[in-house]
Amino acid sequence: MNLLQKLLERAPGFVGIQEKAVDKQKWITRVEDLYKKYIDKKPIEEMVNRDDFRIIRTFHKIDGQEDPFLEKMIDHLAEYKEKVGNAPAGYLLEYNNKIMSRLARAGKMEYKKYLERIDGDMKLTYSVVPQKTMSARQRFTYLYDAEYLLFYKKDGEGYVTSMDAYFKELGEDARAVDYGMAAQQVYTATGGKVPESVILKTKEWTVKALQYTDISLMDKINFLAMLGDTNKVLREYDEAKKCYNQAFMESMQMEQEMTKAMIQMRIKQKLAALDLIK
């Protein structure tokens, strides 16, 4: 097991230096198989340490499905917290949240069962969530009720009500990506076919997201283009054009030429479509 642990620790660096895509993919598959063998063979009690947690975070996939191995981690979270700190709790919180998101978006009320875990067997996990005016369970109830309403019920107004309550609780802890993704989900789930009041709220959220100084370049470009789309829906065509042009200018800073070219082509298409309307 010690040898396998060392191999997994060094694997990312080794895979990264493979020049041929086919060789890289072969090694990725081999390493994934080694990881599965490792967690199958090694008792969970022996994995409560920083090195193994680093390996888990590197190779374990959280895909919104129940996972027997991660359930074992939940059972041993108190030991993880003592030996590793709060990082495992944050990791397991992400695991449960992704399950709730998948179920809520699909309209499966089973997501409420996972909400119950927040102050049940996963209470220690969610103890890392700051509590201001409401419990962790209430906070995430607002969030996943919002996703249920938007993606399954197509209820944009209900979504806004729940998300506003969620953001009020987040307060200063809210990040640019929180506001930006909340706005983007409206278009992802409904194609923008919601009342104008909801579109106006997505504009408010996107403007807030763009006010953050620590926003990544890719997010900034994405949110500017989305703000352009929102202004277009609101028939504020001059404002839409300004947003698209600013998104294009920001894209000039990108280093990956292929990605830059694709993004700029998409922005040019948006500008051309806008000119046909004006």
Name each model feature, range by range:
Residues L3-K278:
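Oxidative protein folding and maturation machinery
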